[in-house]
Each structure stands twice: as C-alpha cells, then as structure tokens.
Amino acid sequence: MVKYFLGQSVLRSSWDQVFAAFWQRYPNPYSKHVLTEDIVHREVTSDQKLLSRRLLTKTNRMPRWAERLFPANVAHSVYILEDSIVDPQNQTMTTFTWNINHARLMVVEERCVYRVNSDNSGWTEIRREAWVSSSLFGVSRAVQEFGLARFKSNVTKTMKGFEYILAKLQGEAPPKTLVETAKEAKEKAKETALAATEKAKDLASKAATKKQQQQQQFV
C-alpha cells in the first residue's frame, strides 16, 4: 500500500513573482529543517524550457518508536533530489522531488504544478501530489502514516516560507512567525505588568501621604 496525498494551494502573487521566489526560498524562518541546497544541473531546451536539478539536505528527525529500530549512528539527514521544468511561454512550473537515502525506511515522492490561477490572473495556484511508501516488514503502515503526517506539516511550512519570501521581494513587511508574535506578546505583557506595578506604587504612596496628613490634623 502507498499513502497518497492531493492538495491545492493558492498564493496571492503572480506566476512571475512565485517563479522568482521559488529560487530564493531558502533560508526563511520556516525552513530551519533545510540545511543545504545546490544546483547540480541546469539547461535550456530547444523549446525554451528551463530544466534544473537541485540537491537539498534536510534534517530527518525520526519518531521515538522508529529510533529504537535503527542504530544510533543512522544519519539524521535526508538527501532530496528536485527536478524542475519551467515553461515560461505557458507559465507553468512542474517540480518532482524524492529522497535518495533512507529509501528502505521510507520513500516520499512529490509532484507540484504551479500555474496561473483560473479565477485571478494575478494569483498562482499549486497542485501538489505526494506518494509515501515503505518496505519495512511489519511496520510499513505506521511508517507511512508518520511520513504522511510529516509531509503535511512540511507543506504548511513551505507555504508560510513562500509567503514570507514573496513579501520580502515585493517590499512588504514579511508575516511574523509564531515565535516573533509570542516574543512581542511577552514583551508587551512585561511592559503592562511593569506599568501596573508602578501605578500601584504611586497609588500606595499617595494613600500613605494622605493618611499621614490626616493623622497630623488630629495631633
């Protein structure tokens, strides 16, 4: 059995902008699991299509139950090959990605097609398909379930990373990460607490002064 995923996403940016952002996605605050990226091949075909192959290195933290099945020295990084075909005339970009190590444990294959959104020519739609398989006897189903859940989580990070880079390229303020938002909220709460403490001290001081004045009136 192979786990299959199909998803549709929309980026509110033109195809040209998304195409430019695609090659500048890393690094971004949502791609900390992406360690390296290298272009290993690139060519322009006779029909003016751009073909590229990239090698990416990503962290591959295993679930705890899987760590018990493998030696401690098993690499925690996964190598990904990404082939892409860019057709500027028809404004489409198709990417194929798959892992080239840990293949016995799990293989994740992904196909994405980027094209102009049918409802808004200024937007870009992404059709994403993925196939997750495992050849491990006895635990392949659990591995595939884990792989599919991890893939969905990474898709969310990918889209947030895209939006972050697109905002930077378009001169807008990039959307804040949850860490940045939490940090700001913490700082604001600290400032509010400090202001409340100072106000309480001021009120207490005024109350003490007033009480002292009242006592002096009766002396």
Curated annotation (Swiss-Prot):
Pfam families: PRELI
GO cellular component, one term: protein-containing complex
Domain PRELI/MSF1: 36-174
InterPro entries in UniProt: PRELI/MSF1_dom, Slowmo/Ups
Top-level taxon: Eukaryota
Places the protein is found: Mitochondrion; Mitochondrion intermembrane space
Keyword Transit peptide included in the entry's annotation: yes
Gene Ontology molecular function: phosphatidic acid transfer activity
Predominant cellular place of this UniProt entry's protein: mitochondrion
Catalytic activity: a 1,2-diacyl-sn-glycero-3-phosphate(in) = a 1,2-diacyl-sn-glycero-3-phosphate(out)
Keywords, comma-separated and alphabetical: Apoptosis, Lipid transport, Mitochondrion, Transit peptide, Transport
Known role: Involved in the modulation of the mitochondrial apoptotic pathway by ensuring the accumulation of cardiolipin (CL) in mitochondrial membranes. In vitro, the TRIAP1:PRELID1 complex mediates the transfer of phosphatidic acid (PA) between liposomes and probably functions as a PA transporter across the mitochondrion intermembrane space to provide PA for CL synthesis in the inner membrane. Regulates the mitochondrial apoptotic pathway in primary Th cells. Regulates Th cell differentiation by down-regulating STAT6 thereby reducing IL-4-induced Th2 cell number.
Oligomer and partners: Forms a complex with TRIAP1 in the mitochondrion intermembrane space. Interacts with OPA1 and AIFM1.
Name the record gives this protein: PRELI domain-containing protein 1, mitochondrial
Organism: Bos taurus
